[in-house]
């Protein structure tokens, strides 16, 4: 009997051990119960930290690439103005390159833009000449406002150099263009009855640091003369 029980007990023990081994394979390792040592375990922790940091860096880099920086309103307007000027040069007869552009071509471009203006500029024969608020409509032409032209030239002057142009050959910075803008400003100021003079800002007065309500403190009295005993 005892010899028959031993194989049965051995078989049961083998079955139990096999089930335990299978459970150990299916169950995830519990890292909390076995803290990392200074050798291999510490290295594993470092790899995990490096992996998380690299993953965070890649995700942040991916997020930055997915959301490109939107150009400012000034930069977007400058790009549109430069494209418009480039189209004007291509449609010119004969077509002009950027290196061939001069101040005369800039003046032609500014006069060309007048047909798209929205500012009423009264002629000398108009009864509303010099009237800032005309009470009735008139057949005077629409022109580009001086402020719009001045800002346009400033943007194109910067765009010319940003696109490879040399500052000494910038056609938007020549004297003829500056004189034209001055004439437009003076003529529109007279015709529209407005003033384009910049208001002078008042200089801030220095703050009173005396602390006496605006009245300076009197100087301290002189020290008393030394006594006769002290002199001896």
Curated annotation (Swiss-Prot):
Cellular localization per UniProt: Nucleus
UniProt cross-references to PROSITE patterns, sorted A to Z: ALOG
Gene Ontology cellular component list: nucleus
GO biological process terms, semicolon-separated: mRNA transcription; post-embryonic plant morphogenesis; response to light stimulus
Keyword set, alphabetical order: Developmental protein, DNA-binding, Nucleus, Transcription, Transcription regulation
Motif Nuclear localization signal, chain ranges: 198-202
Pro residues bias (residue ranges): 216-232
Primary location recorded for the protein, binned into one broad class: nucleus
Domain ALOG intervals: 73-200
Gene Ontology terms, MF aspect: DNA binding
Biased composition (Gly residues): 38-53
Annotated region described as Disordered, given as residue ranges: 20-77, 189-232
UniProt family annotation: Belongs to the plant homeotic and developmental regulators ALOG protein family.
Role according to the record: Probable transcription regulator that acts as a developmental regulator by promoting cell growth in response to light.
Matching PANTHER family: PROTEIN G1-LIKE2, PROTEIN G1-LIKE3
Name by which UniProt lists this protein: Protein G1-like3
Organism name: Oryza sativa subsp. indica
Lineage: Eukaryota, Viridiplantae, Streptophyta, Embryophyta, Tracheophyta
């Amino acid at each position: 009997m005892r010899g028959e029980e031993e194989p049965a007990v051995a078989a049961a023990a083998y079955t139990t051990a096999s089930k335990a081994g299978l459970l150990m394979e299916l169950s995830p390792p519990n890292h909390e119960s076995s803290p990392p040592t200074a050798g291999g375990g510490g290295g594993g922790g470092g790899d995990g930290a490096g992996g998380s940091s690299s993953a965070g860096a890649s995700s942040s880099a991916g997020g930055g690439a997915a959301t490109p920086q939107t150009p400012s309103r000034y930069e977007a307007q400058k790009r549109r103005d430069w494209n418009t000027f480039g189209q004007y040069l291509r449609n010119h007869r004969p077509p002009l390159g950027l290196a061939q552009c001069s101040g005369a071509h800039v003046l032609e471009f500014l006069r060309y833009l007048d047909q798209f203006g929205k500012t009423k500029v009264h002629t000398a024969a108009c009864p509303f000449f010099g009237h800032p608020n005309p009470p009735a409509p008139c057949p005077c032409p629409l022109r580009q406002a001086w402020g719009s032209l001045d800002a346009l030239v400033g943007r194109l002057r910067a765009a010319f150099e940003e696109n490879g142009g040399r500052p000494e050959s910038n056609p938007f910075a020549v004297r003829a263009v500056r004189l034209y803008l001055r004439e437009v400003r003076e003529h529109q100021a007279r015709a529209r009855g407005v003033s384009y003079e910049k208001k002078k800002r008042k200089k801030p007065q220095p703050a009173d640091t005396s602390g006496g309500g605006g009245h300076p403190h009197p100087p301290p009295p002189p020290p008393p003369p030394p006594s006769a005993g002290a002199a001896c």
